[in-house]
């Protein structure tokens, strides 16, 4: 094990901390995850596949993927816009915008779902007006999209803001002075500089969107085969719960692997850039 020569703590303390960390990871993450896969596969692969391919499960998987596919691109646009606004402009009320950005982190997802019900429910003025025109939000896919969008909104912006603040505006200003317009500056200067942070934000957004339960549970109505996502089907279908849970676990692990790959690629490029400057 490599140690920092500047650290003076005794070796036994390092091993103690490593042991505590490993014990925590085993008890809280590895063992429960292994238990999920064990229960999912205990009846054999045929039962496992049947649990994932029955019509209700397919509908839940499809809805989960649709929600993520819609929410992630929208969050990419909104996150970039919010990060640009908060890092490139000074205006009255900027601190309020920054505070509101973190609202989905502090508000319970159940409360967030209830907010949408109170706003778009059939017995509200706006919800009644929309339903009279054939647009149903609550207990339908649009409500699921809105609730998921709310709880995932901060992830992209919060990844971009620190990076954009650290990078400053010098390169963008130079591009404008040299005659680039706003779009050229964004595509050739800003986006390449923030692409890794943007990818991290999108990965986190996708993971949260696929696993969201509380807010979506309130607005979905649990209509079987129509508005149930994978987490909700895990709750109401005990026989298929472990199979569906294992699917969510696989998606989560794939997300972590992708994030690790992107981190390694970024570190290699940063190291190569540092060597080229020497």
Regions found by a protein language model. Give the residues of each.
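C-terminal transmembrane helix and the adjacent membrane-cytosol boundary/short C-terminal tail
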Residues: 9, 16-20, 31, 93, ...
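Hydrophobic alpha-helical transmembrane segments of multipass integral membrane proteins
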Residues: 27, 62, 66-78, 82, ...
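Periplasmic/extracellular loop-to-transmembrane helix junction in inner-membrane transport proteins
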Residues: 3-10, 36-73, 88-89, 236-239
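Transmembrane alpha-helices
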Residues: 20, 73, 99, 103, ...
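Membrane-embedded alpha-helices of multi-pass transport/permease systems
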Residues: 30-34, 38, 77-82, 111-114, ...
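Membrane-interfacial helix termini and adjacent extracytoplasmic/periplasmic loops
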Residues: 3-7, 45-53, 58, 93-94, ...
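Transmembrane-helix boundary motif in ABC transporter permease subunits
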Residues: 2-9, 70-102, 114-118, 128-129, ...
């Amino acid at each position: 094990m490599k140690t920092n020569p500047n650290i003076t703590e005794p070796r036994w303390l390092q091993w103690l901390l490593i042991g505590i960390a490993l014990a925590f990871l085993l008890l809280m993450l590895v063992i429960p995850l292994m238990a999920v896969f064990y229960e999912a596969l205990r009846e054999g692969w045929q039962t496992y596949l049947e649990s994932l391919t029955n019509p209700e499960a397919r509908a839940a998987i499809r809805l989960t993927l649709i929600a993520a596919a819609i929410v992630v691109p929208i969050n990419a646009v909104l996150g970039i816009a919010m990060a640009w606004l908060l890092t490139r402009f000074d205006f009255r009320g900027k601190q309020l915008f920054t505070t509101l950005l973190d609202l989905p982190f502090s508000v319970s997802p159940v409360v967030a779902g209830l907010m949408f019900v109170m706003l778009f429910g059939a017995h509200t003025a706006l919800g009644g007006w929309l339903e009279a025109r054939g647009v149903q939000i609550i207990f339908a896919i649009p409500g699921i999209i809105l609730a998921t969008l709310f709880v995932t909104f901060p992830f992209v912006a919060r990844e971009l803001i620190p990076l954009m603040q650290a990078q400053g505006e010098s390169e963008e200003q130079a591009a404008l002075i040299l005659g680039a317009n706003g779009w050229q500056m964004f595509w050739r200067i800003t986006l390449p500089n923030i692409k890794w942070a943007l990818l991290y934000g999108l990965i986190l957004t996708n993971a949260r969107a696929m696993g969201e339960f509380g807010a979506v549970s309130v607005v979905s109505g649990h209509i079987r085969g129509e508005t149930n996502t994978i987490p909700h089907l895990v709750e109401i279908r005990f026989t298929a719960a472990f199979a569906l849970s294992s699917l969510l676990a696989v998606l989560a692990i794939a997300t972590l692997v992708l994030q690790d790959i992107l981190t390694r690629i970024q570190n290699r490029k940063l190291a190569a850039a540092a060597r080229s400057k020497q």
